[in-house]
């Protein structure tokens, strides 16, 4: 296993180890979250974890949870989420995030905002001084409104483009049946204000700014052959 892959496994394992029996767990989406689900499933199968329920944030995490024997539930069926574990595309020094590279940010925000503790798992390349400097901001929009929303985003200083699918003709379609505009901002210095401004645009379902939600970030780091996980 190469050092980078090893690091991702260690971060995922560290996150999965924080889940305790009897908890309701929010399952994130993406490559590191997928590894976390695998380790969580291992703990369920060997009897280390009992009586847990998981709320998936995407079709991907739902399929993985079923594959690894993790009992699933839904937001509407639980009165709490004890812990949510998810990845991120960017993390700033205040632990604000950009998420949505997998077009799952709407359901992710629903689950992560509900959680008593929200843990983010990333590698050090995702740490930035200001959001928007390395990753476009995803905005989920109603299909019939994407042009109108795009013009409104331009007035906010953004440069939107419709996310296109790789293995199908046409745009990416979210689990909710909507489209995604990826918006370039030179730098997002006031993420809370921008999050609200974008969500106030008619036709927007949700954007990928996660402000004030994160309780802990687990950062995987590689130094030569040495792999470590630190908290912030």
Curated annotation (Swiss-Prot):
Q: Mention any one GO cellular component term assigned to this protein in its UniProt record.
A: cytosol
Residues that span the membrane, as ranges:
none
Keywords assigned by UniProt, alphabetized? Isomerase
Q: What class of enzyme is it?
A: isomerase
User: Which residues catalyse the reaction?
Assistant: 108
PANTHER family given in the database record: RIBOSE-5-PHOSPHATE ISOMERASE (PTHR11934:SF0)
**The protein, known as:** Ribose-5-phosphate isomerase A
What organism is the protein native to? Synechococcus sp. (strain ATCC 27144 / PCC 6301 / SAUG 1402/1) (Anacystis nidulans)
What gene is it encoded by? Answer: rpiA
